[in-house]
UniProtKB/Swiss-Prot annotation:
InterPro entries associated with the record: PKS
Originating organism: Arabidopsis thaliana (Mouse-ear cress)
Positions of the UniProt region annotated as Disordered: 1-21, 74-128, 242-271
Keyword Lyase attributed: no
Lineage, opening ranks: Eukaryota, Viridiplantae, Streptophyta, Embryophyta, Tracheophyta
Name of this chain's protein: Protein PHYTOCHROME KINASE SUBSTRATE 3
Gene Ontology biological-process annotations: phototropism; red, far-red light phototransduction
């Protein structure tokens, strides 16, 4: 049983031997292989330079090629070292029993690109990325411009019209443009200009016809306006409409009718002036009646009475003369048992003076009234004396 286990273990080790050899060879001499590949790549970069960017536009990355070359070289070395070894004596249904080993190899192959890159290689990589961006940007612009088309005349321009390929002609549009040119050459301006001229002539004829109808009325109105302006704004100078019509009618007749027209105008002016004059309509004189005489006597007596009353008022003012100032007499003090004192106020003392003045004025008024009654009776007797 132990011998069988050992043989099985040996078989497994023999099946993984090529992979272990590959890893051991990479670990033992990594710098020599990478340095050789870096020198080869540096020489290629030196030959290409910055301006040989055509290789980079093919969108192929260098690290993929380098990893493929490295794996091929390792396989060749393994075949030279072990020519009689079977790569897979016992095929395993699982092709990758150790995924960690495969991951490490792939990661190392990817990371082991060039070693230490030179300044020229870095500049070439930077120029590569920059030029790739510019190229993609220009391609997008060209696609957008190709989508839009500009048409003018008989040509159609797809995008910017910089090259011959971008210009395309449409035969239909060109035929239309040629036909339109021919129509423009055959265009006759006289036919189209006749319409406005005929329209203007028709309007002119209508205008003359209206003038012929309305000329007599307008002339008479003009004559009336001129005569009014030339006149001095007097009632006699304003012409009558009937007289102006008669004048226009008689201008074609004999000169003998002018005198009759002037007479008619004079009579019309006199009639118009009579409206503003006041005439004496009541020329006859009537005898006065008794009622009118009585009314005149009453009005006259009232007028005389008003005059006499005014005269009496003037006399009264002159008779009175200047006003005499009276001093109030203060009464003696009267002793009383109560708290009341004697009358010391001026109002209580002046009552006697006011009563005296009222009595005097009453006497004067009575005398004047008696005198007026006598005068009225005398006036009435004098008025009735003429009957």
């Amino acid at each position: 049983m132990d011998a069988e286990k050992k043989s099985a273990h040996f078989r497994q080790i023999s099946s993984y031997k090529p992979q272990l050899l590959v890893l051991s060879s990479i670990q033992e001499n990594p710098s020599s292989k990478i340095s050789e590949k870096a020198n080869i790549k540096a020489d290629n970069d030196a030959e290409i330079g910055v301006f040989g960017a055509e290789k980079y536009f093919s969108m192929k990355l260098d690290h993929v090629d380098s990893t493929a070359d490295i794996t091929k070289q390792h396989e060749k070395e393994n075949t030279h070292d072990h020519p009689n070894a079977n790569p897979n004596p016992n095929p395993n249904p699982h092709p990758h029993p150790h995924p960690q080993l495969t991951k490490t190899t792939s990661s190392r192959s990817k990371t082991s690109r060039h070693g230490t890159p030179s300044v020229r290689s870095e500049s070439s990589c930077n120029s590569q990325t920059f030029l790739m961006r510019i190229n993609n940007h220009n391609e997008n612009k060209q696609r957008k411009m190709n989508d839009t088309s500009i048409s003018f005349g008989g040509f159609r321009c797809y995008g910017p019209c910089s090259g011959v390929k971008t210009v395309h002609t449409d035969p239909k549009n060109s035929c239309k443009s040629r036909n339109s040119d021919r129509d423009f050459v055959a265009y006759d301006a006289r036919k189209h200009n006749d319409k406005p001229r005929l329209h203007f002539e028709a309007k002119k004829a209508d205008f003359h016809a209206q003038e012929k109808i309305s000329l007599p009325i307008q002339r008479s109105d003009i004559a009336m306006n001129l005569e009014r302006k030339l006149s001095l704004l007097t009632w006699d100078a304003i012409p009558n409409q009937l007289s102006t019509k008669n004048n226009n009618h008689n201008n074609n007749g004999n000169n003998s009718s002018m005198s009759s027209n002037t007479q008619e105008e004079e009579t019309a002016s006199v009639a118009s002036s009579d409206l503003f004059e006041i005439e004496n309509i009541t020329s006859s004189v009537y005898e006065p009646s008794e009622a009118s005489i009585g009314w005149s006597v009453v009005t006259g007596s009232m007028a005389d009475q008003s005059v006499i009353s005014d005269f009496d008022m003037m006399k009264r003012v002159t008779r009175n003369g200047p006003v005499v100032k009276t001093k109030p007499v203060i009464g003696e003090k009267v002793r009383s048992a109560g708290f009341l004192s004697g009358c010391k106020s001026h109002k209580a003392v002046s009552v006697v003076d006011s009563s005296r003045k009222v009595k005097e004025t009453a006497k004067v008024d009575h005398h004047e009234m008696s005198h007026q009654k006598k005068f009225k009776t005398e006036i009435r007797i004098q008025d009735l004396s003429f009957l």
